[in-house]
């Protein structure tokens, strides 16, 4: 009988700063060559589980351990981090924390340099893996010139060079555009088949992850494994809902169409599911009997106008933004999508005045070009993807009050505005808390509050739901919808096709610094050419429509959006 390569036996771990164990009585074996998906809500113990395997716990992060953990038949608590790194390779979720080279090539070559590999062999290895991860054209770029997704691919290439028998990827899809995420899963699958390595993928994005095949799924909740089963059996159970994880959209649509999902043999394979005549009949019947009107109306008077806006970095020959023409309308929820490096974040920074531009930007027919960053912040607020990059104060109240104090407002007036915004953001009860006591999602709301308190007309959010489990995803989006109802214009830069289709009234698609589409989300996702150009990927609802033979897939998508919104409001 094959011995497990990873074995947890009654294993518990408690951080010194925590009152209770983060992992509780974990019992699981993972065998050589297995590919395992690990899912769970924020704080469920997924990353702690992975860090116990790669050695960051206990060799870097200390805590109390009970039980046993064996890696490659060796007691994991008595080896060292260096030895563990020869067995376990890890791609971290925080790409900035893993990037150590001055260029992409230097970062990927780090291990080879330490192992004194000959330069010719080093260059061949780096070029080979850079080609595999789609970074061959960016090898000489500095880390600050790369997007979050590009940094992640560099980290992946650097780990793959090592060829460790165990590979852990912590949220590998979090910063990638949908098409690149799909290609990454295909790449990982090819690597797994070629090397027969043991692969553990920790992810929130269950639907996208299940594009790939997994031997097992481990589902975490409150530090415990509540499911250890096949993807199909997990989708049939109620465990995902119990753990606060969103099931694939097609599974929800099947239930809305009153399909008995428990009777489906391989629920994790959408193509197989849609071969059933019963499924085809039920879904088509649901479409025929239900109206799919799209009530989204976004056009009023333009609030923000961009005319022939260009941005060019000094060390790039081509413009990062190229003659962008764009109107943003009052009280709309606009999504901006595109491939990694398309210019999405650059566009936001150009609007805020962080970058020099050519062309013209107007706000309510008022020239924006001559205004300083501080003056523009009275009209436009920008919330960065990572809240830790924005927060500079120790206490919640002080962080939200920071901008008003910088404007010289009286403390009595600041108190009124800050407390009002904290109530709107659901943070009033925590107003005297330290920032470090907050979850990632709560920190995200603090950064939104720090922008909202300045009362801008437009709020730009870069990846508002990145890395969020379904509970916190809904929490953030419900909050943004409420702000929109109160009159704020919301611009969301996103890779999340669910967010795009369910929450925005209009979508602008960028590719290579240019606007290639400006229409409704459903029409964007129904256009295969646009999806290919911008590295988007149609959701499982579109795939379901095609497999079933629905001539107008957008009808199914719009029907699902309308019905799902109605269900969530109940």
Swiss-Prot record:
Annotated residues for binding of ATP 1: 40-47
SUPFAM superfamilies in UniProt: P-loop containing nucleoside triphosphate hydrolases
Keywords in alphabetical order: ATP-binding, Cell membrane, Membrane, Nucleotide-binding, Repeat, Translocase, Transport
SMART domains recorded: AAA
Location in or out of the cell: Cell membrane
Alphabetized GO MF terms: ATP binding; ATP hydrolysis activity; ATPase-coupled transmembrane transporter activity
Full protein name: Putative ABC transporter ATP-binding protein SAS2569
Natural source organism: Staphylococcus aureus (strain MSSA476)
Organism lineage string: Bacteria, Bacillati, Bacillota, Bacilli, Bacillales
């Amino acid at each position: 009988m094959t011995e497990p390569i990873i074995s947890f036996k009654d294993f518990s771990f408690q951080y010194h700063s925590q009152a209770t164990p983060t992992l509780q009585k974990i019992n699981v074996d993972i065998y050589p060559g297995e590919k395992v998906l690990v899912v769970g809500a924020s704080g469920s113990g997924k990353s702690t589980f992975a860090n116990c395997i790669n050695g960051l716990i206990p060799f870097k992060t200390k805590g109390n351990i009970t039980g046993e953990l064996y890696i490659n038949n060796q007691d994991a608590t008595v080896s060292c981090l260096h030895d563990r790194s020869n067995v376990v390779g890890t791609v971290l979720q925080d790409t900035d924390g893993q990037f150590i080279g001055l260029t992409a090539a230097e970062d990927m070559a780090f291990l080879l340099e330490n192992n004194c590999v000959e330069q010719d062999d080093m260059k061949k290895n780096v070029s080979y893996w850079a080609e595999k991860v789609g970074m061959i054209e960016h090898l000489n770029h500095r880390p600050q010139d790369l997007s979050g997704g590009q940094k992640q691919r560099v980290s992946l290439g650097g780990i793959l060079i090592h060829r460790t028998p165990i590979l852990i990827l912590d949220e590998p899809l979090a910063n990638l555009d949908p098409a690149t995420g799909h290609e990454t899963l295909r790449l990982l699958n090819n690597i797994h088949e070629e090397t027969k390595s043991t692969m553990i993928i920790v992810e929130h994005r269950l639907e996208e992850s299940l594009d790939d095949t997994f031997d097992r799924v481990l589902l975490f909740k409150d530090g415990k494994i509540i499911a250890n089963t096949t993807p199909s059996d997990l989708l049939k159970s109620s465990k995902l809902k119990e753990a606060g994880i969103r099931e694939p959209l097609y599974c929800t649509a099947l239930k809305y169409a009153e399909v008995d999902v428990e009777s489906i043999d391989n629920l994790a394979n959408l193509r197989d599911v849609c071969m059933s005549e019963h499924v085809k009949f039920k879904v088509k019947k649901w479409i025929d009997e239900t109206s799919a009107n799209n009530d989204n109306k976004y056009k009023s008077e333009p609030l923000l106008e961009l005319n022939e806006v260009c941005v060019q970095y000094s060390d790039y020959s081509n413009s990062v933004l190229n003659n962008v023409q764009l109107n943003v309308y009052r009280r709309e929820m606009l999504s901006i999508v595109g491939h990694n490096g398309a210019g999405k974040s650059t566009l936001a920074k150009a609007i805020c005045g962080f970058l020099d531009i050519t062309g013209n930007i107007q706000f309510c027919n008022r020239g924006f070009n001559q205004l300083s960053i501080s003056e523009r912040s009275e009209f436009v607020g920008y919330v960065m993807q990572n809240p830790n990059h924005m927060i500079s104060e120790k206490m919640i109240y002080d962080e939200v009050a920071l901008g008003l104090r910088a404007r010289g407002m009286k403390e009595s007036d600041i108190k009124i505005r800050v407390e009002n915004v904290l109530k709107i953001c659901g943070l009033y009860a925590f107003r005297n808390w330290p920032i470090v006591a907050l979850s990632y999602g709560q920190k995200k709301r603090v950064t939104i509050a720090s922008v909202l308190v300045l009362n801008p007309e437009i709020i730009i959010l870069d990846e508002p739901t990145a890395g969020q489990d379904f509970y916190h995803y809904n929490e953030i989006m419900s909050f943004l919808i409420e702000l929109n109802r109160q009159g704020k214009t919301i611009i969301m830069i996103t890779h999340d096709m669910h967010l795009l289709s369910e929450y925005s009234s209009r979508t602008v698609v960028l590719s290579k610094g240019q606007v290639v589409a400006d229409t409704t989300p459903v029409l964007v996702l129904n256009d295969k050419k646009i999806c290919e150009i911008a590295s988007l990927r149609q959701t499982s609802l579109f795939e379901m429509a095609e497999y079933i033979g629905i001539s107008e897939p957008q009808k199914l998508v719009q029907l699902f959006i309308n019905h799902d919104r109605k269900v969530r409001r109940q």
